[in-house]
Amino acid sequence: MSYFTAREIASITIFAALWGILSTTLSPIFYKLFHLPFLCDLIGFTSIILAVWWVEKIGTATSVGLIATIINFMFRPTAMHFLGFSAASIIFDILAFTSGYKRLFEQKILGSILLTAISIISAAVAGVIIGALFMSPMALQRWGGVLGWAGLHAIGGTIGGVVGISLVNALISRGITPPKKRKKEGKD
């Protein structure tokens, strides 16, 4: 038996495609207008949170990040900075697993705080990698160096975390829950 079911793989690829396509189409426009990385983080961490909530298995965030990276490179082969988000998705995966999915998604207040913190940490890691390896020194200087760039990504991670958590809570309030939870509740 495989680790991910067919439905889980479909969910992972849908959220990865959402991230990959929106990042290749909208994020460059936002970045050119404002020179801020917030939209990349918002799209990425919202997609990851939704996928992890739906599947609740280690490897989900990593899979979403790697598939989104492949999609990104298919449309924008020179956008090497996206490798920072690949690393961030791995960090997110590890931190979400060690925090416990039950704690993240069944304890609303604690889960919201933890998911936001995980998004902030993961986004900051992406910012450090992108700043250290892929940004020009002139662009970095404007934002206070690598740490300043990591801070901007952390702000984007905060926004993405809040949006992702809000969407999860909105879906739950409308009765939309992952298949595993429906089986436990006898709704499937």
Segments predicted by a language model, with ranges:
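Hydrophobic transmembrane alpha-helices
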Residues: 1-55, 59
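Short helix-perturbing small/polar motifs within transmembrane alpha-helices
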Residues: 13-14, 21, 86-128, 165
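Interfacial aromatic-anchored transmembrane helix boundaries in multi-pass membrane proteins
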Residues: 25-37, 68-96
